[in-house]
From Swiss-Prot:
EC number: 4.1.1.1
A molecular-function term among this protein's GO annotations: pyruvate decarboxylase activity
GO biological process, one term: aromatic amino acid family catabolic process to alcohol via Ehrlich pathway
UniProt cross-references to CDD domains, sorted A to Z: TPP_PDC_IPDC (cd02005), TPP_PYR_PDC_IPDC_like (cd07038)
Residues involved in thiamine diphosphate binding: T390, G413, S414, I415, G445, S446, N471, D472, G473, Y474, T475, I476
GO CC terms, sorted: cytosol; nucleus
Keyword Lyase: yes
Name by which UniProt lists this protein: Pyruvate decarboxylase
């Protein structure tokens, strides 16, 4: 095999970086490209219900595998995916967006083709994507095409941001040297500037040496930029109390003896709030300081000794070191921190009270009770997706087993995201370990936006748990504004009929409305095995919500009403 098509080259390269499932929809400008997927052993085409869901699915897949690929067609297809791509950009998720575009000659002649705006401008959609992409490429020359593909894959992986790659329909069948595949794409980070890195290390070590009450706070980019292992070692060596943000949930093993809980500013438990805000040194790993991640910007550190570790810069107090990457800094810090922290005397960490109060089996389910019980159902290695709304807030009250991976979209907050993301996560989990469970918590309102992807799960024999929280509409919106407004209402669905409607043969669909029904179901040994796709309708009161969401809604309503 001395030569291969450019299309096959793309998929061979993706397989080399462990991307085995491709998401998207066929369209006439990408059909020849899609043919090449089936030429690569071990590669599969998911085939989504729509492009938005495909982008969501790619996001969910990438959070577990490091990167993903979604393929759409020019214009109508790519624009449908952009909300999902924007979410991946905001949340630091590496998704390669490949767009099949018209041939180079059609573009040069400015033909009035379908899927265009009718003005001869073939660059407009590419330009739209450039604002939500780390980099973009429009292939125009077969000779440079392989190196451009390699650059796009590397950038997607390293930056953990979306990258746009346009492939003209007339180029995908042209041949390139197969020998190019023998040189792997370099996915390593470039070394830090030694002088800047040493200055950071020396300053941080001095701060650690002087600290009497330090804490470690892990946020979203701790997971996204692959420093979970370094952060765990930092906790092990120093014994500093460790906390996570809502977006960082799952970044630290919550069974670790030095884990103290979830910090969300004023929405934190009193014990966690006091522990974090009274610290004399905060080591913040991968922070994304958005409103819902910080209790509407209510962080209130008493110290100015704050070290922020980011993927592409470090901030120590008021000094910023651009280009200094946290991966290398943390690795070198681990070799020296033991001596710097030797004077630290460990203090007790907060422990959330476990809700073990007996309740009658006939007690109707309520959010506060459910989220304290979810942790009892979870197992090590689970992937837990929580939808924007009550689920994303309620999960902060759940104690995770070790090695639990949490997926939510706290910053971008696109309603329905987890419907598609669950599909992607289920594909990824199957590739990593077929026994790994994927568990979704989604509201009845959010489900209506992306429900079609359940059919794709069934088609591929995937076996997620789909917990549908039925509170009869958009509770999070009602809490912010319009409690009785018609626009926060939805049509009630027969949720238990969804799986057979989409063609499922081996499935379980069940409704739980009381604590007794919940306990009986979640403790059942057969139910705990991911042997089939399951949909569980959880009946909840209309205005019932986790206490932290009620407080957040009040803060959000207040901010929305401000005049200046």
């Amino acid at each position: 095999m001395s030569e291969i098509t450019l299309g096959r080259y793309l998929f061979e390269r993706l397989k080399q970086v462990e991307v085995q499932t491709i998401f998207g929809l066929p369209g006439d400008f990408n059909l020849s490209l899609l043919d090449k997927i089936y030429e690569v052993p071990g590669m599969r085409w998911a085939g989504n219900a729509n492009e938005l869901n495909a982008a969501y699915a790619a996001d969910g897949y990438a959070r577990l595998k490091g990167m993903a690929c979604v393929i759409t067609t020019f214009g109508v297809g790519e624009l449908s995916a952009l909300n999902g791509i924007a979410g991946s950009y905001a949340e630091h998720v590496g998704v390669l967006h490949v767009v099949g575009v018209p041939s180079i000659s059609s573009q040069a002649k400015q033909l009035l083709l379908h899927h265009t705006l009718g003005n001869g401008d073939f660059t407009v959609f590419h330009r739209m994507s450039s604002n939500i992409s780390e980099t973009t490429a429009m292939i125009t020359d077969i000779n440079s095409a392989p190196s451009e593909i390699d650059r796009c894959i590397r950038t997607t992986y390293i930056s953990q941001r979306p990258v746009y790659l346009g492939l003209p329909a007339n180029l995908v069948d042209l041949k390139v040297p197969a020998s190019l595949l023998e040189t792997p794409i370099d996915l390593s980070l470039k070394p830090n500037d030694p002088e800047a890195e040493n200055e950071v290390l020396e300053t941080v070590l001095e701060l650690i040496k002087d600290a009497k009450n330090p804490v470690i706070l892990a946020d979203a980019c701790c997971s996204r930029h692959n420093v979970k292992a370094e952060t765990k070692k930092l906790i092990d060596i120093t014994q500093f109390p460790a906390f996570v943000t809502p977006m960082g949930k799952g970044s630290i093993d919550e069974q670790h003896p030095r884990f103290g809980g979830v910090y969300v500013g004023t929405l934190s438990s009193p014990e966690v709030k006091e522990a974090v805000e009274s610290a004399d040194l905060v080591l913040s790993v991968g922070a994304l300081l958005s409103d819902f991640n910080t209790g509407s910007f209510s962080y209130s550190y008493k110290t100015k000794n704050i070290v922020e570790f980011h993927s592409d810069y470090i901030k120590v107090r008021n000094a910023t070191f651009p280009g200094v990457q946290m991966k290398f800094v943390l690795q070198k810090l681990l070799t020296k921190v033991k001596d710097a922290a030797k004077g630290y005397k460990p203090v007790p960490v907060p422990h959330a009270p476990r809700d073990n109060k007996p309740v009658a089996d006939s007690t109707p389910l309520k959010q506060e009770w459910v989220w304290t019980q979810v942790g009892k159902f979870l197992q090590e290695g689970d992937v837990v997706l929580t939808e924007t709304g009550t689920s994303a807030f309620g999960i902060n009250q759940t104690h995770f087993p070790n090695d639990t991976y949490g997926i939510s979209q706290v910053l971008w907050g696109s309603i329905g995201f987890t419907g598609g993301a669950t599909l992607g996560a289920a594909f990824a989990a199957e590739e990593i370990d077929p026994k790994k469970r994927v568990i979704l918590f989604i509201g009845d309102g959010s489900l209506q936006l992306t429900v079609q992807e359940i059919s794709t799960m069934i088609r591929w024999g995937l076996k997620p748990y789909l917990f549908v929280l039925n509170n009869d509409g958009y509770t999070i919106e009602r809490l912010i504004h319009g409690e009785t407004a018609q626009y926060n209402c939805i049509q009630s669905w027969k949720h238990l009929d969804l799986l057979p409607t989409f063609g499922a043969k081996d499935y379980e669909a069940v409704r739980v409305a009381t604590t007794g029904e919940w306990n009986k179901l979640t403790t059942d040994k057969k139910f705990q095995e991911n042997s089939k796709i399951r949909l569980i309708e959880v009946m909840l009161p209309v205005m019932d919500a986790p206490s932290n969401l009620v407080k957040q809604a009040q803060l959000t309503a207040s901010i929305n009403a401000k005049q200046e």
